[in-house]
Amino acid sequence: MKRTFQPSVLKRKRVHGFRARMATKNGRQVLARRRAKGRKRLSA
């Protein structure tokens, strides 16, 4: 069985990156929650 995690920086950024989060209303809510919680890293 192949491993499910096949890393790709490009896919990671496109799906979970800061600009991807900012692009949608819900994504901005994610960032707001993470800021409120005090996360050191907001996004990938």
Curated annotation (Swiss-Prot):
Keywords: Ribonucleoprotein, Ribosomal protein. One of its GO terms (cellular component) is ribosome. It comes from the Bacteria. It holds the Pfam family Ribosomal_L34. InterPro entries: Ribosomal_bL34 (IPR000271), Ribosomal_bL34_CS (IPR020939). Coiled coil: none annotated. GO terms for molecular function: structural constituent of ribosome. GO terms for biological process: translation. The keyword Ribonucleoprotein applies. PROSITE patterns: RIBOSOMAL_L34. NCBIfam families: rpmH_bact. Belongs to the bacterial ribosomal protein bL34 family. This is Large ribosomal subunit protein bL34. It comes from Chromohalobacter salexigens (strain ATCC BAA-138 / DSM 3043 / CIP 106854 / NCIMB 13768 / 1H11).
